Design a protein with these regions (language model features):
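Acidic, turn/loop-rich segments in luminal/extracellular domains of secretory-pathway
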Residues: 21-86, 142-159
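Extracellular ectodomain surface segments
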Residues: 1-29, 92-149
């Protein structure tokens, strides 16, 4: 008689038959994400953004699991390797403030009071940040982006 093959066990790691065991149909957390394997062999892997944030664009890491297939009284174990590829994560820019007297110019240059400073982050390990735009449309003055991490803000009284 023909029997249907089903997945009967799932474990973390690449050594067949060993590693932390999971439950079929429930999530098993690996290093870079969570794997859910169903008895029929279908599976879903959800990458953990926080775990993969430090990857640069194109960098790859793997999450490895092993599973057991049962058909009747026969079993076999195999390894499933999931490759996680880094992407260019968006930086997180924090608001900055400055003050200037009317008619004067506020200059922020590279140094301890950069527009780009310790409160602005990019999770990619080797990314560097730069100012690409300054939001305009204020009611009290205008701003101009300068070189990396610098800006000039000239305020003038508007009628």
């Amino acid at each position: 008689t023909n029997s249907t093959s089903t997945i009967t066990a799932i474990r973390k790691g690449g050594t067949e038959g060993s590693g932390d065991a999971g439950t079929i149909g429930s999530g098993l957390t690996g290093t870079y994400g969570t794997l859910t394997v169903n008895a029929n062999g279908s599976y879903t892997y959800v990458a953990d953004q926080a775990a993969a944030d430090a990857l640069d664009t194109g960098d790859t890491v793997t999450d490895v699991f092993n599973y057991t297939v049962t058909s009747g009284s026969q079993t076999d174990t195999a390894v499933l390797t999931i490759t996680v590829t880094g992407i260019n994560d968006a930086p997180v820019a924090a608001n900055d403030t400055g003050s200037v007297n009317e008619g004067a110019t506020l200059t922020v240059s590279n140094g301890s009071s950069d527009i780009i400073d310790d409160n602005d982050t990019d999770a990619d390990a080797s990314s560097s940040l730069s100012v690409s735009a300054i939001r305009t449309g204020g009611t009290e003055g205008s701003g101009t982006a300068g070189s990396i991490g610098a800006a000039w803000l000239s305020l003038e009284e508007w009628p």
